[in-house]
Regions:
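Structural signature of outer-membrane beta-barrel domains
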Residues: 31-35, 69-73, 114-118, 161-167, ...
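Flexible, solvent-exposed loop segments that connect beta-strands
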Residues: 37-40, 70-89, 117-138, 167-186, ...
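Residues that define the transmembrane beta-barrel architecture of outer-membrane proteins
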Residues: 22, 42-46, 87-91, 136-142, ...
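Bacterial Sec-dependent N-terminal signal peptides
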Residues: 1-27, 195, 199, 209
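Predominantly the C-terminal beta-signal and adjacent terminal strand-loop region
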Residues: 74-75, 139-209
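Repeated loop/turn-to-beta-strand initiation elements of outer-membrane beta-barrel proteins
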Residues: 22, 59-62, 104-107, 152-158, ...
């Protein structure tokens, strides 16, 4: 799958560049991230990247994005009385379809494919690298959200990312660290808030993200 990512991106953005009305921009913001596993809490993280917005006719549009996004979770009292915090950095590619509603609102939904670039966990300030055995490199999910377009250049987006892939596997151990033979799996759950800035706006001053 990794070898397919580059040509897919090339094709998508090449198609967009052929359209006179296609717009390009950058975006960045905050993530409230968690993994749906027992005793997990959300962590505050970030995301940043670029997008291309292509009108398809009427009020319908297609928007591919390429983001660096940090996700993860915090497990309460995981190691005796200490919390365990996971931080995972992904290269994410949302491919959303949407519709303009009125002059300022855009609703969108679509798949998101992510590849894990780095990750680690922290117990009471002590950091460690993630053991590859317990993590999935790839994540696939569904994104849905809404954008409020303040001006032709600036917009605010609220989006929820619902992961389908078990990205983390936690083993159950006793107080001596002995494997008890069980494990728990979890999927990414992320609420995103971002600000978007359009760099180029083609030939049409349309409402865009």
């Amino acid at each position: 799958m990794k070898t397919l990512l580059t040509p897919v991106l090339f094709v998508l953005f090449s198609i967009c560049s052929l359209k006179a009305q296609t717009t390009f921009g950058v975006k960045g913001g905050l993530n409230l991230a968690s993994i749906n596993i027992d005793n997990s809490d959300m962590i505050l993280a970030w995301q940043a990247g670029a997008f291309s917005h292509m009108p398809l006719g009427g009020k319908v549009f297609f928007q591919p994005e390429l983001l660096i996004s940090r996700k993860g979770t915090r497990l309460k009292d995981f190691f005796y009385t200490s919390d365990l915090t996971f931080n995972i950095v992904y290269l994410s590619m949302p491919l959303v379809m949407g519709v303009e509603a009125g002059e300022h609102f855009l609703f969108h939904i679509g798949p998101e494919l992510s590849y894990r670039l780095a990750g680690g966990f922290e117990i009471e300030g002590q950091e460690s690298n993630i053991d590859k055995e317990y993590y999935s490199d790839w994540d696939f999910g569904l994104d849905a959200g809404v954008t409020y377009q303040m001006t032709r250049r600036f917009g605010l987006t609220l989006r929820y990312c619902f992961g389908f892939t078990n990205v983390m596997q936690i083993k159950f151990v006793d107080e001596l660290g002995q494997d008890l033979g069980g494990f728990s799996e979890g999927k990414n759950r992320v609420l995103q808030a971002s600000i978007n800035y359009t760099i180029s706006s083609g030939n049409k001053a349309s409402v865009i993200e």
